[in-house]
């Protein structure tokens, strides 16, 4: 069940949202699928090539890329559903997995980006005091906790399966009967899944800026590490502002103002667009790996040099 879903009662009125979704979703999802699969698939390959020299940063990035790749694999099914005019043909179990995979990816991405930024900040500012926190072992444990927490928190989405009416099987649609529970889930998700991580990122950003503006630090060594930490945090914040903030804001507004007897086409279409923006974060994360990864560029060059030999 998703807030961009369309209640069945809409089909009885002159609402244009269904046509919009049929035209918009398939092409955008397939574009995200192509670039996301290419970028994250190759990134995973690079990370696995360097597993013997892994760092905590690489561990977080590998988990982030894995989360993105798993989600991206569901996008062709979503594209097919909307291309058929919101008619699901892949069975009840696959339907339940669709919404579940979307929100598991969204919030694991948010938490991996946040923890990655915090760990990089701590490793830069307090490298020896926080060594146990920034170790590879601690990174794997923390990633495991994030996976379990997000997957367990999203488990309620597995309750909602496909529904058949007039020989049309719907999936990913908003159910008026479960609207109140969905509204409560949204408020909790916004607070814990978005606002808390975003505030954490903002604090890290302000602190690292403050450190960089302090007494002069040599260009090599500490200052270079500070800049890499700042790059990580800035890319994470850009992802939050472009991908996650619009969706959470419009999703909440859409739910708060939702009326089952009204089309609400303009707001509904805007929410549809922001959902694809949230999904597109999977395409942007490879830029984080390239510009802020631990020796990612060097390892990338090593792979290409082997290919040319």
From Swiss-Prot:
This protein's UniProt keywords: Cell membrane, Disulfide bond, G-protein coupled receptor, Glycoprotein, Membrane, Receptor, Transducer, Transmembrane, Transmembrane helix
GO cellular component terms listed in the entry, alphabetical order: membrane; plasma membrane
Membrane-protein topology: Multi-pass membrane protein
Expressing tissues: Widely expressed at low levels, with highest expression in the spleen, thymus and adrenal gland, and lower in the kidney, brain and peripheral blood leukocytes.
Subcellular compartments: Cell membrane
Family matches, as Pfam families: 7tm_1 (PF00001)
Transmembrane stretches, start-end: 27-47, 57-77, 99-119, 139-159, 188-208, 230-250, 272-292
Entries under InterPro entries matching the protein: CLT2_recept, Cyst_leuk_rcpt, GPCR_Rhodpsn, GPCR_Rhodpsn_7TM
Membrane topology, Cytoplasmic segments: 48-56, 120-138, 209-229, 293-309
Predominant localisation class: membrane
GO MF term set: cysteinyl leukotriene receptor activity
Extracellular side stretches: 1-26, 78-98, 160-187, 251-271
Disulfide bonds: 95-171
Family listed: Belongs to the G-protein coupled receptor 1 family.
Annotated function: Receptor for cysteinyl leukotrienes. The response is mediated via a G-protein that activates a phosphatidylinositol-calcium second messenger system. The rank order of affinities for the leukotrienes is LTC4 = LTD4 >> LTE4.
Protein name: Cysteinyl leukotriene receptor 2
Organism of derivation: Mus musculus
Top-level taxonomy: Eukaryota, Metazoa, Chordata, Craniata, Vertebrata
Gene name per UniProt: Cysltr2
């Amino acid at each position: 069940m998703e807030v961009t879903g369309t209640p069945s009662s809409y089909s009885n009125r002159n609402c244009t949202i269904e046509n919009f979704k049929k035209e918009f979703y398939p092409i955008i999802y397939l574009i995200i699928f192509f670039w996301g699969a290419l970028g994250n698939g190759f990134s995973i390959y690079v990370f696995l090539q360097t597993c013997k020299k892994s760092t905590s940063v690489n561990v977080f990035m590998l988990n982030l890329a894995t989360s993105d790749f798993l989600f991206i694999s569901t996008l062709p099914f979503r594209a097919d559903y909307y291309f058929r005019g919101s008619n699901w043909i892949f069975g009840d179990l696959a339907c339940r997995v669709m919404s579940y995979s979307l929100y598991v990816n969204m919030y694991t991405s948010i938490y991996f980006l946040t923890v990655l930024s915090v760990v990089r900040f701590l490793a830069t500012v307090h490298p020896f005091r926080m060594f146990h926190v920034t170790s590879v072992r601690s990174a794997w444990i923390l990633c495991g906790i994030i996976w379990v927490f997000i997957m367990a928190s999203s488990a309620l989405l597995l309750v909602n399966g496909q529904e058949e009416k007039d020989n049309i099987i719907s999936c990913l649609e908003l159910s008026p009967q479960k609207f109140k529970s969905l509204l409560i889930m949204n408020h909790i998700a916004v607070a814990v899944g978005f606002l808390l991580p975003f505030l954490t990122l903002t604090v890290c950003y302000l602190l690292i800026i403050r450190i960089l503006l302090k007494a002069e630090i040599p260009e090599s060594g500490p200052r270079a590490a500070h800049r890499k930490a700042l790059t990580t945090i800035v890319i994470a914040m850009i992802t939050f502002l472009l991908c996650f903030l619009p969706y959470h804001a419009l999703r909440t507004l859409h739910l708060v103002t939702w009326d089952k007897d009204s089309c609400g086409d303009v707001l509904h279409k805007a929410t549809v667009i922001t959902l694809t923006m949230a999904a597109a974060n999977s395409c942007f994360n490879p830029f984080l790996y390239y510009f802020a990864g631990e020796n990612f560029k060097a390892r990338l060059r090593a792979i290409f040099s082997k290919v040319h030999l």
